[in-house]
Amino acid sequence: MLHPRARTMLLLSLPAVAIGIASSLILIVVMKIASVLQNLLWQRLPGTLGIAQDSPIWIIGVLTLTGIAVGLVIRFSQGHAGPDPACEPLIGAPVPPSALPGLIVALILGLAGGVSLGPEHPIMTVNIALAVAIGARLLPRVNRMEWTILASAGTIGALFGTPVAAALIFSQTLNGSSEVPLWDRLFAPLMAAAAGALTTGLFFHPHFSLPIAHYGQMEMTDILSGAIVAAIAIAAGMVAVWCLPRLHAMMNQMKNPVLVLGIGGFILGILGVIGGPVSLFKGLDEMQQMVANQAFSTSDYFLLAVIKLAALVVAAASGFRGGRIFPAVFVGVALGLMLHEHVPAVPAAITVSCAILGIVLVVTRDGWLSLFMAAVVVPNTTLLPLLCIVMLPAWLLLAGKPMMMVNRPKQQPPHDNV
């Protein structure tokens, strides 16, 4: 017979697996639709019209029209496409289900149109809202927080293709003063994360790792080099942190989301022309292209890092629906490659991984997630001790510093209760 503790853990196992599978399927469907639309906008249409897909007029035109389209969705859809991601953490309160259709449409348009944001925040919002709404009907005795945790764990597993990230994140958020052992509380979330990751793996495998030269043995000087790289990435990220609320306030003085997002899309188009097609979209596929292109110089990597960081700030400040983690990883890769080109004596594995650690730490203020992203992009077990050590001064630098988030005006609710 099972111990009562084991039976308690098993109670939410079936709902956890169902939520994990559903979280992954929602992500897969959204990404597939966005991919089809992206192919139409950036491959078939310009080919049919006889226009180069990387021509300035096409890049500016598509991104401007994308901004206008997203603005129309936010303006006229019920619930106004959910809360503004610039004002929200990755895992937030559930929104009314009525806001979800508009949010999904706005996300798909942004992903396909080349906006420099990832899918993580809107997908998380959708999955949490559905899990809470459906779970409250089927199992009303389970509180909303439990459904929120299961949905967010399933989404994290689906996004990254592994339950490891969820285990790391929730090991700190669930480690309270309760007498219930930590792994008892992690059991159901990890079931959801594993189900989400396995379901994603049936359809495609998220490819984060980069073909970077293997790092052999850690030296004492490497720790200093890594800490300096992380500090440079943090400094770049804090510039974005300073700019975001100010640009957000300036853009939203216009009040009309169609105008705000249209202007935001136009600015993103100009940035895309300067940075080229590799600086567009969420950044995961593009960072693979960036590493594969041997023609890039130090100045090219620097330009890509600056353009992508600026595009991330503009997209978030304008109100596009999307997440900031994936484009931040692109910025980290560009910074790391730039620093390696500038100082070849420092291995690229160190510069890239430590730059990712620093910039993701600025964006998320989550040490485990930052370590995870650095470790999966540059998969090398020799780097893990170095990354853990470099995390310490990086965390000290950010202690008490503002987060990459806009404080919501007090008179505005987080979302429309319609």
UniProtKB/Swiss-Prot annotation:
Gene3D superfamilies: Clc chloride channel (1.10.3080.10). Keywords: Cell membrane, Ion channel, Ion transport, Membrane, Transmembrane, Transmembrane helix, Transport. It is a multi-pass membrane protein. It is found in: Cell membrane. Its main location: membrane. GO terms for molecular function: chloride transmembrane transporter activity; monoatomic ion channel activity. InterPro entries: Chloride_channel_YfeO, Cl-channel_core, ClC, ClC-type_chloride_channel. It holds the Pfam family Voltage_CLC. One of its GO terms (cellular component) is plasma membrane. The chain crosses the membrane at residues 10-30, 54-74, 99-119, 120-140, 149-169, 186-206, 223-243, 258-278, 300-320, 322-342, 343-363, 371-391. Belongs to the chloride channel (TC 2.A.49) family. This is Putative ion-transport protein YfeO. It comes from Shigella sonnei (strain Ss046). The lineage of its organism: Bacteria, Pseudomonadati, Pseudomonadota, Gammaproteobacteria, Enterobacterales. The gene is yfeO.
